[in-house]
Amino acid sequence: MKFLFRECKRPLNAFSAANTYMDCLVQTKTYIQLLILILFCIATVYLSFPSFTLKYINNIDILLQYIIKALYFSFPITFVFLLIMWDQRYLFSKKISFHQLKISFFTAFIIYIIMLLFLSVLISFTTFNGTSNPIENEGMTNMFLKTPGIAIQLIGENIMFVSILFFWHKIIRSFIISPITSITTSLILSGSSFGLLHLSTYNYNWVQCLTIIGIPAIAQMIFFLVFKNIHMGYMLHFNYNLIIILFNYIVSN
């Protein structure tokens, strides 16, 4: 009986630990600071690359084009995030071991398989009709050339993950005390918000944004909370995208 009690307490302790960790990260931050991060998240997604610079960029190597555009995407939100969170950087940034890298790849693979199964069920039993990501329509050669740029862009996306999570947790904790309720609600709202930021990318298919984008986003935020390391969230995200690229390459050949 004592063993059963201990096993039942583990999930509760995990929720409590995650909740306490999030409290430590956001308790010294004002709503204005976190709102600034959210506004930068929205601007990062919806402010396109300056058209007047394209005539210069289009004349350079395509690999460098992707890298420059990725830097334009990631640098502003990353800079503002570090500016606001600098005093607590040691709480969310740690070195990654090789064992943790393997865990991130294996977890990304499991998430990818689950999402494939979920998508197949969704298509089979509903009228759901997905919209492909424009990147997937560029051919495998361009996809491989884009990989360095994608790696840089995912830094910005990872910053967006945690920024949105911090924002929602700060709000939720102002009126919800229960660790389980607060951290669960924060994760669901954060994943949904990040998914809905992709509405224009997926032709305003909100179901696809909430499921195909939102669910993996929640998994990546959980990964961040489990390891208390923003880099682990990034590696899970990077490996997830890498698996998608490799799978598309295998299927196309």
What is each model feature region?
Residues 1-32, 90-93:
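N-terminal juxtamembrane cytosolic/stromal segments of multi-pass membrane proteins
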Residues 23-40, 68-78, 102-121, 219, ...:
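Alpha-helical transmembrane segments of integral membrane proteins, especially early/N-terminal helices
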Residues 28-86, 136:
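Alpha-helical transmembrane segments in multi-pass membrane proteins
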Residues 30-34, 65-73, 100, 104, ...:
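Residue-level signature of transmembrane alpha-helical entry/exit and packing/kink sites
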Residues 48, 81, 85, 118-119, ...:
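Hydrophobic membrane-targeting signal helices
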Residues 48-49, 81-91, 168-173, 225-227:
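Structural signal for the C-terminal ends of transmembrane alpha-helices
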Residues 56-67, 88-160, 164-177:
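Juxtamembrane helix-loop-helix connectors linking adjacent transmembrane helices
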Residues 143-253:
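Transmembrane helix-loop-helix hairpins at the membrane interface
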